[in-house]
């Protein structure tokens, strides 16, 4: 995955961000998800999807699932265009999202499975992310 991920990131980050993150930003406009993000109950994951930290009600779970379904559809399209795996595209977007979209005070999940809250320092990205 590392080689393909670096190639995808190096060659197509701008296009992926336009196609993928624009969809993500629109999808995250729901009030339940926005509130949960601000409270640290929902956060970005290194795998390119939203995650729920701890227990959540059915309505929040449904909205997070709906967002992740839209993300997967965007990742699937990009993967087909580039001839790579969906997982590689999702991880590349995950790297960009952790870098550019996780605000101070927001929760995020790295590949080690530990939820963290972003402080003033940049997030230490997984080794497969191109810096």
Pin down the residues of each PLM region.
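Sec/Tat signal peptide C-region and signal peptidase I cleavage site
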Residues: 21-29
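Bacterial N-terminal signal peptides that target proteins for export
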Residues: 2-13
């Amino acid at each position: 995955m590392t080689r393909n991920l670096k190639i995808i990131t190096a060659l197509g980050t701008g296009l992926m961000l336009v196609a993928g993150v624009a969809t993500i930003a629109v999808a995250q406009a729901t009030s339940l998800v926005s509130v949960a993000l601000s409270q640290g109950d929902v956060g970005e994951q290194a795998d390119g999807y939203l995650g729920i930290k701890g227990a959540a009600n059915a309505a929040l779970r449904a909205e997070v699932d709906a967002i992740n379904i839209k993300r997967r559809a965007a990742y699937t399209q990009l993967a087909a265009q580039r001839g790579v795996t969906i997982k590689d595209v999702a991880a590349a977007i995950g790297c960009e999202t952790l870098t550019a979209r996780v605000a101070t005070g927001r929760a995020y999940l790295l590949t080690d499975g530990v939820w963290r809250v972003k402080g003033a320092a940049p997030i230490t990205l997984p080794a497969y992310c191109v810096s």
